[in-house]
A protein has these predicted regions:
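C-terminal transmembrane bundle of multi-pass solute transporters/carriers
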Residues: 2, 75-78, 86, 92, ...
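Helix-loop junctions on the cytosolic side of multi-pass membrane transporters
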Residues: 139, 143, 185-217, 422-432
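Substrate-agnostic recognition of the 12-TM MFS/MFS-like secondary transporter fold
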Residues: 28-46, 66-84, 88-103, 118-177, ...
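Small-residue hotspots at the loop-to-helix junctions and early N-terminal turns
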Residues: 44-47, 51, 56-63, 155, ...
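Residue-level signature of transmembrane alpha-helical entry/exit and packing/kink sites
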Residues: 26, 42, 115, 119, ...
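MFS-fold secondary transporters
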Residues: 44, 53, 106-110, 126, ...
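Juxtamembrane intracellular "pre-TM" segments in multi-pass secondary transporters
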Residues: 2-28, 205-244
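Transmembrane alpha-helix termini and helix-breaking/packing motifs in multi-pass membrane transporters
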Residues: 46-56, 107-113, 167-187, 261-270, ...
Length: 432
C-alpha cells in the first residue's frame, strides 16, 4: 500500500460542513441521530456515576460501571462485526436504539442502595447493543458520502461529539440540579427513540448486503468470517497497526473515574445554598465539559492541515498522544478547578486527534466487505483498553492512592503508545 496516498478531500471549514449537511440528506439524518442520542448519553453517564458514588461511596463502583459499559463490547465485537457485514446496518442501528431506550427507562427503578445492583446488568445490556450500533454507524459513512468527503464527515462527527459532550455536560448538570436524576434518565431514553426515527428515514444502498445469504444463528458461532477478517487485517500493513491506535488512548478509562471522584471530593461546586450532592454533580459536569472543549478543538484545528495526506494524519496522531500525556501529567499537580479544566482540555485536544484520524485511516484502508469487522475489532480493542485502565484507576484510588497521583501516572503511561507509534512511523518510512 502506498505509504502516503493523497486523500483528495475538500477543504474542511464551516462552509464545507454546511454544504455536506444541506446537500446530503442521508448524512444529515445520521448526524441528527448522533446529536440527540449523544446529548442524552452524556446526561445519562453523569447521572449513573453520580448515583453509584452517592449510594456506595466507592470509586470502585464507578470503575466497575465503566468496565461493564465497555468490556462486553470487546466480547461481542466479533459477532457484531459478522452481523454488520451480513445485515443492513440501518436495521441494526434502529434495533439497537429501541432496545437501549427500554433499558434506560428501566434505570428509573433504581431508587435505593438495596437495588443498586440493578444498574450493572442494565449497563451490560445497553453496552451489548452499543457494540452493534457504533460499528454500523462508522461503516455506513463511506456508503452515504462521496469519497472526497469522508474526512470531512468524520471531522464533523467528531466536532459534533465534542459539542454534544459540552452541551450534555452543561445541561446534564443543570437538569439534575433542578429536576433530579429521573428527568435525566427519561430524556436519555427519549433521545434513543428520536435517533431511531432519524435513521429510519435514511435511504441508501448497502453494497455488502446485496445478494447476501440469510443470516442464521449458527453463523454467529461460525468463526470463519472472523478468521477471514483477521487474515485481511494482517495482510494490510498499516491497517494492522492502525487498528490498535485508539487502544493507546489510555487516558479515557481513568478519566471517567478521575472526573467523578475529583468532582465529588476535590472540585465540587460550593455555591451558597446549593445541595452538596448537586454541587458534586456540577463539578463533574465542568470537568466533562472541559473534555468536550478540548475534543472539539483538536480535530477542528488540525484537520485542515492533516486531512489531505495520510502521512500527516499519522504524524498528527503521534502529537495527539503527546498532548494527552502532557494534559494528564499536569492534571496531577492541579489544585484548582480552573487549572484542572485547562489540563483536561489539553489532554482531550490530543486524544480527539488520535480518535478522529485513526477512524479516517481505518476507513481509508479497509474494503467495504470487511469494514464492519474492522470497526468492531477497533471498538472492541479500544473498549478493552478503557476497561483495564479504568478498573486499575478505581482500584488504586480505593486503596488510598490520591487522585492526583493516579492522574499523573496516567499521563506518564501515555508516553508508551506515543513511542510505539513513533517507531512504527520510522519503520514505514524506511520501508517506503
Amino acid at each position: 500500500m502506498d505509504p502516503a496516498p493523497e486523500l483528495g478531500i475538500t477543504d474542511i471549514s464551516l462552509s464545507a460542513y454546511l454544504r455536506l449537511l444541506r446537500g446530503n440528506v442521508n448524512f444529515r439524518r445520521l448526524w441528527g441521530a448522533q446529536v440527540v442520542s449523544e446529548i442524552g448519553d452524556w446526561f445519562y453517564t453523569l447521572a449513573i456515576y453520580n448515583l453509584l458514588l452517592q449510594l456506595t461511596g466507592r470509586a470502585g463502583s464507578v470503575a466497575l460501571a465503566l468496565v461493564l459499559q465497555v468490556l462486553p463490547q470487546t466480547l461481542v465485537g466479533p459477532a457484531a462485526g459478522v452481523i454488520n457485514d451480513r445485515l443492513r446496518r440501518k436495521h441494526v442501528m434502529i434495533v439497537a436504539d429501541l432496545g437501549r431506550m427500554l433499558i434506560v427507562f428501566s434505570m428509573l427503578f433504581v431508587r435505593s442502595k438495596g437495588v443498586v445492583w440493578m444498574v450493572y446488568p442494565l449497563l451490560i445490556a445497553e453496552t451489548l447493543l452499543a457494540a452493534f450500533f457504533e460499528p454500523a454507524r462508522n461503516s455506513v459513512i463511506p456508503n452515504i458520502v462521496e469519497k472526497e468527503d469522508v474526512v470531512l464527515a468524520n471531522t464533523l462527527s467528531s466536532t459534533t461529539w465534542s459539542l454534544n459532550l459540552m452541551i450534555g455536560a452543561a445541561l446534564g448538570g443543570a437538569v439534575a440540579a433542578l429536576l433530579g436524576r429521573d428527568a435525566v434518565f427519561i430524556l436519555n431514553a427519549l433521545s434513543f427513540l428520536a435517533s431511531a426515527f432519524f435513521i429510519l428515514r435514511m435511504r441508501f444502498v448497502e453494497p455488502h448486503a446485496e445478494g447476501a445469504r440469510p443470516l442464521h444463528v449458527r453463523d454467529l458461532v461460525d468463526f470463519s468470517p472472523i478468521v477471514d477478517g483477521i487474515r485481511y487485517v494482517r495482510s494490510q500493513v498499516r491497517l494492522r497497526y492502525a487498528i490498535f491506535v485508539k487502544a493507546g488512548n489510555l487516558i479515557i478509562g481513568p478519566g471517567w473515574v478521575l472526573f467523578t471522584v475529583m468532582g465529588q471530593n476535590e472540585f465540587a461546586v460550593r455555591w451558597h445554598g446549593l445541595d452538596p450532592a448537586r454541587g458534586a454533580f456540577l463539578g463533574m459536569s465542568i470537568l466533562l465539559g472541559a473534555r468536550g472543549v478540548g475534543a472539539l478543538l483538536g480535530p477542528l484545528l488540525t484537520a485542515p492541515w492533516a486531512g489531505q495526506w495520510v502521512r500527516r494524519l499519522e504524524i498528527a496522531i503521534f502529537w495527539g498522544y503527546l498532548g494527552a500525556a502532557a494534559g494528564y501529567t499536569l492534571l496531577g499537580v492541579s489544585s484548582h478547578l480552573w487549572q484542572a479544566s485547562l489540563c483536561v482540555m489539553l489532554a482531550h485536544f490530543g486524544s480527539a486527534i488520535v480518535w478522529v484520524f485513526s477512524t479516517t485511516l481505518l476507513q481509508r484502508y479497509s474494503d467495504d466487505s470487511f469494514r464492519g469487522r474492522v470497526f468492531s475489532a477497533d471498538l472492541g480493542i479500544f473498549m478493552l483498553s478503557i476497561a483495564a485502565s479504568g478498573a486499575l484507576a478505581g482500584i488504586f484510588i480505593d486503596r488510598g492512592v490520591s487522585v492526583h497521583t493516579v492522574a499523573f501516572a496516567t499521563g506518564v503511561a501515555m508516553l508508551l503508545p506515543a513511542l510505539v507509534w513513533f517507531w512504527a512511523l520510522r519503520f514505514w518510512r524506511q520501508e517506503a
